[in-house]
């Protein structure tokens, strides 16, 4: 989220849904952002950060199903049919009525899409959902020198509550690499895998080759096209 806005508003980092709602309203009123919280169609799926505080399904998987089975109080049930998910949707409806969510959220591109990125970097969005490593890329793409993004905790109904996020479906995560026993040079293969976690590898993966697909201006990477 926009840490610089939170500081300028004199507000604390939100921990509960009520605190987050109060912050979003303040961002909308103070900065005129039409998308105080950026949500796409995944907002009503189960791979988002908002649902978990209601005990509703939250599964960190890019190819998660629209619903999945869960066990609640010893009863097997479809995750999106529990009472918590209904509360979650009721809250989203209220936020939609308050003008905090884009009127066209069902057709909104993801936060990794160029259009979604522009919502975040242009000052039209206060809170969004994406991986922490993406914050540096959003900052580099923004023309706002004051933009400062910070991580926010998953909101809960009451302070002190814990959220439960399912990551057990995939033993090695959604994206993984493995080295076959047939590999002729496993040490070189490991070096290749490690490369993508270096500064040079991250730069190459996100912007491509400097001088070809991007240029570095004042310490910030910019696409040439």
Predicted regions and their residues:
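Extracytoplasmic/secretory soluble proteins
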Residues: 1-225
